[in-house]
Design a protein with these regions (language model features):
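Long, C-terminal-biased catalytic regions of enzyme "large/alpha" subunits
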Residues: 1-92, 99
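Residue-level detector of conserved, well-ordered beta-strand and adjacent loop positions
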Residues: 16, 143, 258
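Short coil/turn linker and secondary-structure boundary residues
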Residues: 25, 39-42, 59, 154, ...
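Intrinsically disordered, low-complexity Ser/Thr/Pro/Gly-rich regulatory segments
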Residues: 38-41, 68, 72-230, 247-248
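Amphipathic alpha-helical repeat elements characteristic of tetratricopeptide repeat
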Residues: 45, 97, 237-240
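Proline- and acidic/polar-enriched loop/turn elements at helix boundaries
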Residues: 46, 119, 214, 258-259
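C-terminal extensions
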Residues: 103-106, 225-286
Length: 286
């Protein structure tokens, strides 16, 4: 059996990211992503050596991902599902509604009670807030920016705009007796990334940002992997139409299926297909 060299990168091989930027290929990054997906040593060893055998200058990170996913899938279904997390979130569209519910679940894991898609009064005008999260007289007003392209970035224009909206809502709520003693904070959540200017502006104005890999170690991918709140779009035993049907009735994360398998009744799956799906869900949720 071959072994992985954990310290060696393929020297001078440049890969192209979804944004069009180029960076040196890192074996360490590939290993880390496979470990997060739950792949065991032998599977990681096989995939890394496979990638080393064909990687070339200018190859896209998507091509590397697709190859790794294919090899994972041939070894372990649930592991492949978790490795496909970024792609799965990109498949939650075309509307941002399922993503809003995913973010709502993330906030609930932090001890917040949540509401989604709420129209509220500001001091000057009314506003629709994607997620309102409340805990111990602290209220977070969340704007969700869902992107269906991995290369998309959220520019400084977004926190500039959201900051003014949040301030209008806060100004109104500070006049209402039911919000006496409350503190408020604006938040922007995205499945993509923020520009440096967007991050700087948000920090300067006490806004909470949540992106795919921001804050470092506490980004969306980290929370989902740690808490195992995977969207149903990771599931290999459901087709696109079936996933869409479930999301339309509010079934957005695998935990919902794990807790209440009856939500699948409307799909009219065969007993064999249902058994395979529930087994995949069980393995994913842990």
């Amino acid at each position: 059996m071959s072994t992985i060299n954990n310290t060696r990168d393929i020297k001078n091989v440049m890969v192209r990211k979804a944004s069009g930027e180029e960076e040196k290929f890192s074996t360490k990054k590939l290993i880390a992503s496979l470990e997060r997906a739950g792949a065991d040593f032998d599977v990681i060893d096989h995939i890394v050596n496979d990638v080393h055998s064909w990687i070339f200058d200018g190859v896209t990170t998507r091509k590397i991902y697709d190859r790794a996913f294919s090899l994972l899938r041939s070894n372990k279904f649930a592991t492949a599902s978790r490795y496909g997390l970024k792609k799965a979130i990109l498949e939650m569209g075309p509307t941002g509604y399922p993503f809003e519910h995913l973010i709502s679940r993330v906030m609930e894991l932090g001890g917040y009670s949540t509401q989604t898609g709420i129209v509220v009064d500001g001091f000057c005008v009314t506003h629709e807030v994607d997620v309102i999260a409340t805990k111990n007289k602290q209220q977070v007003l969340v704007e969700c920016k869902y992107g269906q392209s991995a290369g998309r970035v959220v520019s400084v224009k977004v926190p500039l705009y959201i900051h003014s909206r949040v301030n209008d809502i806060i100004r109104k709520r500070q006049t209402l007796p039911e919000f006496e003693g409350f503190s408020f904070q604006g938040c922007i959540a995205t499945n993509t990334r923020f520009t440096t200017d967007a991050i700087d502006y948000a920090k300067c104005n006490n806004m909470w940002l949540l992106a795919w890999d921001y804050p470092v170690g506490q980004g969306l991918k980290d929370i989902i992997d740690r808490e195992r709140i995977y969207p149903i779009t990771v599931l290999n035993n459901l087709n696109k139409a079936q996933k869409q049907q479930l999301m339309e009735v509010g079934v957005v994360v695998c935990r919902q299926i794990h807790a209440e398998p009856k939500v699948l009744d409307s799909l009219q799956l065969t007993s064999r297909k249902l058994s395979a799906l529930l087994n995949e869900v069980k393995n994913i949720c842990g």
